[in-house]
């Protein structure tokens, strides 16, 4: 299965490769409240050589249904960016801090 298309561009002494992964070509996880498309290896979806891009190891497109969401869980040594395109997202961290995100806002969390 081909997960994307690659194109090489000659930029002087170096070659730059672009790997385009269309939404329908990415691995997908679906539950009753989540539709997630994974750009890199994630969970049970493993493909040799698709381990990320440098230090970026997870880049998921998560669609969360109203009333759904991730339960309390920890993070370590991560920078997490959440960007809401539609609707609202409530967030609470392990220290009890809360916030709400809506379109036009992004959240960056260091954990």
Q: Across the structure, where does each feature detected by a protein language model lie?
A:
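Short, conserved beta-strand element in jelly-roll/cupin
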Residues: 59, 75-90
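Short beta-strand segments in beta-sandwich/barrel cores
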Residues: 63, 87-91, 106-107
């Amino acid at each position: 299965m081909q997960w994307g298309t690659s194109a090489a561009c000659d930029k002087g002494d170096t070659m730059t490769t672009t790997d385009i992964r269309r939404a329908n070509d990415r691995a997908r996880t679906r539950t009753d409240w989540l539709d997630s498309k994974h750009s890199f290896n994630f969970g049970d979806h493993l493909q040799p050589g698709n381990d990320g891009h440098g230090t970026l190891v997870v880049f998921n497109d998560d669609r969360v249904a109203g009333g759904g969401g991730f339960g309390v869980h920890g993070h370590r040594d991560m920078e997490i960016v959440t960007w809401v395109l539609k609707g609202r997202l409530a967030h609470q961290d392990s220290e009890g801090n809360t916030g709400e995100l809506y379109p036009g806002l992004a959240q960056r969390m260091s954990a």
